[in-house]
């Protein structure tokens, strides 16, 4: 229950308090999470336009998209997200060579699925990031994207943007490249 604390003309608390609203705790959240969501006006729902855009997305990646990209599916990338994460959006690989290291950083290619200036794009810009609490997440993108299509799960084809850097044994970059 939320109440307004009212003081009289001398600064003393006036009783009884004025009850202004009831804060409901959603399943999987705590009163502290609900309070943070309310106090910071964090968005938790998706508009009908975004729901329609998400419904049009397919989880199977078009073979034509895969054919245009560098195939790195046989490389042993590891995700750098926690074990309990659902949205594995980045992965790394380091290879030791005779004179240098190859560092690869793969990031889920969200832009392939979120069109510029679409409702989803505008909402993602507004949200700016996913908000992580100890027991729940308020995602920047709908679940179908963040936890499925753009999640770098093992043994599942995903589209990524890769940064590749050759680094000498002193830690100096020798070259870099970016590709899909």
Walk through the language-model features, giving the residues of each.
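Charge-lined substrate channels and their catalytic hotspots, especially those that engage the 3′ end
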Residues: 1-104, 111-156
